[in-house]
């Protein structure tokens, strides 16, 4: 993460210059307080920290019941850019997301709110929000922690410490649970407006076609709720292609619980599967919907709504679907209900721009859905995922869970990181205690985590969140022979564009730890210059920071 904007690398562009360069200077005023001392409206770098603190103090606090409260908190932290109108027929939303990533990277780009979007020649009222969990500081904000305004690595590790605390709070080391609370229909905000039958028309809402090569417009952030007598209730984020005013094609992969539930219902001879799709979710429901957190190997039925409550520290308010018994988040912006014809032929879906940043292939056989009922809040807020251009969700809970699982077989593991802007690459730090341990650890990680195609193992003195340190240690400590192992065939990610067989990949383990003499390394490994500075002049770094740190931080920000 350290190669992003916070370090001043990559020819840093100030937020003021970025806004001016994209033609948004006039539209950012509602969300960035300007002053003579802060003409850019950048609340993170504002000299007057009291104004920033005041905005944060008066903003909604976690646990957030709605996406509206959560976005208000992002705004208070200076992480939101509002655009009154944008032409998605010209793919301006998509282009702006790419531009933001060009300037700020995956980890420090703002969230966006588009009030009105041009789609298929018509201006449709939103708002539509994007990149809502892209910035690393959202890992703190979503869970009620205050991020460090100057160091995203500090923020990220603060969030990871909170996740470990949550897991430590239970006897079995799993996420805590608080059972949901069911509201009456008239109490649920998601039931403010009701559409039924022919009144339902998904094309009237601001669901967009994200990429020019995508198959069409998508509901690509919906939490798809399904139910099964053995597996229980489930919700997962499966993109849904809009193929008509009242039809959706549901891209749930064969390993997803939603697909397994619909398939099981068909095998039982059922003719119809009931589905409810929640759109505009609170940040914890969104996280659980898209991240591999709730279900671990060997789990049977899992109450994901209770896990959401446990992670929030407060029971989730739910309401019964109008056309089925499924419980859905009461504060969601929209609930799309419908029926999956289980006795009908499956349909094609896609193509769609995937998370590796490449166009994925068309799927040949997916379940599809007839939309029979829609309820929503007045003027619903919709979310759009710019897949492959942004960090999709807060990743600290996932990395902490992986670390705890892997420590069962790697007790000396220090930290694990798989950066979302380098899909397929992962970094692992260990407290090395024996020769051969680097390759052994890397092999374990590669076999356990399918997304890890390139596994780099480093010593304890290297920071896996610091991209520069990772490249430095590969250049200075790694000897390709013998500190490399190729795994010819392993479990891969199904969206990897380089895979010949979907879900399979070769892998490489790179042992970038200091090689011991028993491994063919030097008898006496030279010390790093920085380590010698810390050893021989132990006060130098602290003195430099105290005297010049603020000037260095502000350099290039105006």
Tell me the role of every PLM-derived stretch.
Residues 14-22, 27:
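N-terminal export leaders
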Residues 1-14, 38-41:
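N-terminal secretory signal peptides
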């Amino acid at each position: 993460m350290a190669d992003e904007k916070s370090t001043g690398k990559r020819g840093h562009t100030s937020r003021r210059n970025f806004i001016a360069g994209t033609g948004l200077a006039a539209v950012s005023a509602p969300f960035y307080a300007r002053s003579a001392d802060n003409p850019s409206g950048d609340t993170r770098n504002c000299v007057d920290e009291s104004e920033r603190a005041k905005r944060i103090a008066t903003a909604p606090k976690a646990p957030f019941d709605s996406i509206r409260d959560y976005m208000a908190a992002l705004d208070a932290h200076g992480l939101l850019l509002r655009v009154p109108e944008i032409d998605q027929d010209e793919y301006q939303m998509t282009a702006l997301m790419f531009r933001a990533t060009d300037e700020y990277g995956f980890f420090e780009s703002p969230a966006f709110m588009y009030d009105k979007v041009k789609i298929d020649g018509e201006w449709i009222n939103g708002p539509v929000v994007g990149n809502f969990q892209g910035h690393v500081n959202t890992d703190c904000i979503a869970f009620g922690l205050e991020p460090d305004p100057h160091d995203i690595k500090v923020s990220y590790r603060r969030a990871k410490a909170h996740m470990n605390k949550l897991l430590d709070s239970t006897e079995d080391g799993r996420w805590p649970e608080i059972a949901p609370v069911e509201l009456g229909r008239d109490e649920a905000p998601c039931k403010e407006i009701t559409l039924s039958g022919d009144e339902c028309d998904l094309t009237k809402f601001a669901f967009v076609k994200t990429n020019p090569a995508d198959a069409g417009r998508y509901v690509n952030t919906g939490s798809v709720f399904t139910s099964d007598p053995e597996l229980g209730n489930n919700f997962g984020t499966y993109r849904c292609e809009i193929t008509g005013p009242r039809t959706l094609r549901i891209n749930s992969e064969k390993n997803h619980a939603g697909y397994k539930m619909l398939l099981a219902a068909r095998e039982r001879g059922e003719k119809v599967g009931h589905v409810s799709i929640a759109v505009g979710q609170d940040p914890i429901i969104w996280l659980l919907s898209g991240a591999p957190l709730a279900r671990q190997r060997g789990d049977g039925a899992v109450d994901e709504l209770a896990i959401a409550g446990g992670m929030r520290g407060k029971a989730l308010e739910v309401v019964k679907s109008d056309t089925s018994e499924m419980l859905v988040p009461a504060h969601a912006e929209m609930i799309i209900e419908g029926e999956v014809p289980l006795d009908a032929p499956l349909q094609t879906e896609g193509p769609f721009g995937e998370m590796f940043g490449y166009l994925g292939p068309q799927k040949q056989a997916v379940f599809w859905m007839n939309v029979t009922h829609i309820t929503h809040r007045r003027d619903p807020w919709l979310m759009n995922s710019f897949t492959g251009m942004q960090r999709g969700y807060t990743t600290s809970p996932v990395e902490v869970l992986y670390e705890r699982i892997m420590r069962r077989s790697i007790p000396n593991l220090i930290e694990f990181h798989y950066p979302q802007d380098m899909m397929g690459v992962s970094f692992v730090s260990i407290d090395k205690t024996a020769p051969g341990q680097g390759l052994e650890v890397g092999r374990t990680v590669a076999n356990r985590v399918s997304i890890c195609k390139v596994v780099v193992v480093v010593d304890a003195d290297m920071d896996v969140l610091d991209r520069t340190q990772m490249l430095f240690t590969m250049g200075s400590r790694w000897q390709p022979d013998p500190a490399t192992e190729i795994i010819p065939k392993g479990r891969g990610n199904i969206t990897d564009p380089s895979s010949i067989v979907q879900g399979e990949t070769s892998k490489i383990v790179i042992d970038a730890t200091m090689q011991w003499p028993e491994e063919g390394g030097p008898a006496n490994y030279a010390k790093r210059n920085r380590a010698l500075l810390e050893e021989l002049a132990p006060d130098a770094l602290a003195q430099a920071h105290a005297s010049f740190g603020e000037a260095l931080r502000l350099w290039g920000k105006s």
